[in-house]
A protein has these predicted regions:
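Membrane-proximal, proline-rich intrinsically disordered regions
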Residues: 22-85, 134
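Bimodal feature
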Residues: 2-3, 44, 199, 229
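Structured, solvent-exposed acidic/aromatic patches
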Residues: 90-270
Length: 270
């Protein structure tokens, strides 16, 4: 009996390498699914993330979105920052009078502001960043950087220090940057994105044309928007960091493409 068991064990060890050599990847691959190569070639890999990121800049909805994203705007802006600053009032006694109008901050409204302007935008931006590192498509990443800053600067101005320079680096604990560090990084990131898209515009090419809900892939309009965003951020620093404000305001205004000056330049989701 002992010898029989030994023979069985020997046979098992002989068969094991044969099992390990089976091509399980091929067996478990869906032949009808879009491959990574096809997704990168057609823009599908990051197209949805570009659209999602654009919708987080100013979260408003459509009937197709039902109420989720509309309620997100209400809690993130209307009943939090808008009422706190006096731009918006109420005809409903929210939380029996315990709300931002009476300076009694509701945690779910406050957290909604951070989630809307930072957390949800981060996931989409991270996917585009990883794809750019894999494919080398820096035009897509430039667009994502502009959209990210459009979202994150609201979080910065609402909450103060946020994770920025080390965000997306795969760290278990991401350190927070000071406001000055974030502004400096945002200006530099905008400058890099503007340079990338200006080069693209000069070549006559488009960026994410089929997925760009704002400008339909027009890099010139995106450069104008990015320069205008740079100018806006610079004006935020007018009194606390006048030299930095002046430097980046001049950078935006003196760019060859310039800033938004006409109604046709407006950024809107159509």
């Amino acid at each position: 009996m002992k010898k029989i068991n030994q023979y069985k064990l020997l046979v098992a060890f002989c068969i094991l390498p044969c099992w390990a050599s089976c091509d399980y990847e091929e067996v478990n691959t869906n032949p009808y699914e879009v491959t990574d190569e096809e997704a990168n070639r057609d823009g599908v890999a990051v197209g949805g993330s570009i659209m999602s990121l654009a919708r987080q800049v100013f979260p408003v909805g459509t009937p197709a979105n039902k109420t989720d994203i509309i309620n997100e705007y209400q809690t993130s802006f209307n009943v939090s920052a808008d009422v706190w600053s006096g731009y918006f009032s109420q005809n409903n006694n929210w939380y029996s009078g315990s709300n931002h109008l009476t300076y009694y901050l509701q945690d779910d409204w406050t957290s909604s502001t951070y989630t809307s302007t930072y957390t949800k935008a981060y996931a989409s931006w991270k996917k585009i960043k990883e794809n750019a590192e894999e494919t080398g498509n820096m035009a897509n990443y430039a667009l994502a950087q502009i959209l990210k800053i459009s979202c994150w600067h609201k979080a910065l101005e609402t909450f103060g220090p946020i994770p920025y320079t080390y965000a997306g680096e795969g760290l278990l604990v991401v350190p927070y940057d000071t406001e000055q560090e974030v502004y400096t990084a945002m200006f530099n990131d905008l400058k890099s994105a503007i340079t990338e898209l200006t080069s693209l515009a000069n070549s006559g090419a488009k960026v994410m044309e089929d997925f760009d809900l704002v400008y339909a892939g027009d890099p010139v309009k995106w450069v104008k928007y990015a320069n205008s965003l740079m100018l806006r951020l610079a004006m935020r620093l007018k009194y606390c960091a006048p030299d930095m404000a002046k430097q980046w305001a001049h950078e935006a205004l003196n760019h060859s493409v310039g800033v938004m000056t006409a109604k046709d330049d407006e950024a809107k989701i159509s």
